[in-house]
């Protein structure tokens, strides 16, 4: 790799690390090309990305970013998964690791917080931002629905009483 290409790779990685909210580091030794493509497509579908680069270049790119602490994890054949959503990359990585034993999660970082393997798994078990928004909207709409049901309930009861009285009168 030429010096200019290395510099461009470092700048690209640095820009990625500056804008990401979470990074997951994993070993991928022994994965087939098809498995790596599957990982990339799953990450892309979740709004995350996967980068494989030389560890030395990645360590240089980490300098001056919030995720600088994951530099110690960059040993051997490593892949770095990043996402803006704090749950997307960890969730896909953990699910992929369950299906592929050769994909081993080493740790990660969320902002300036360093995560070990258990931290990444805990982060993956949290609901995504969209799921949380859905629950919040559901909680906000529920009281309005109950009020609407309560205001229509007395009218419905009166209508049933009148209907019962009318059918009783017809029967007599």
From Swiss-Prot:
Keywords of this entry: Ribonucleoprotein, Ribosomal protein, RNA-binding, rRNA-binding
Gene Ontology biological-process annotations: translation
Keyword hit for RNA-binding: yes
GO molecular function: large ribosomal subunit rRNA binding; structural constituent of ribosome
Family, per entry: Belongs to the universal ribosomal protein uL10 family.
PANTHER family linked: 39S RIBOSOMAL PROTEIN L10, MITOCHONDRIAL
Record HAMAP family: Ribosomal_uL10
Subunit and interaction comment: Part of the ribosomal stalk of the 50S ribosomal subunit. The N-terminus interacts with L11 and the large rRNA to form the base of the stalk. The C-terminus forms an elongated spine to which L12 dimers bind in a sequential fashion forming a multimeric L10(L12)X complex.
Function comment: Forms part of the ribosomal stalk, playing a central role in the interaction of the ribosome with GTP-bound translation factors.
Name this polypeptide is given: Large ribosomal subunit protein uL10
Source organism (scientific name): Rhodopseudomonas palustris (strain HaA2)
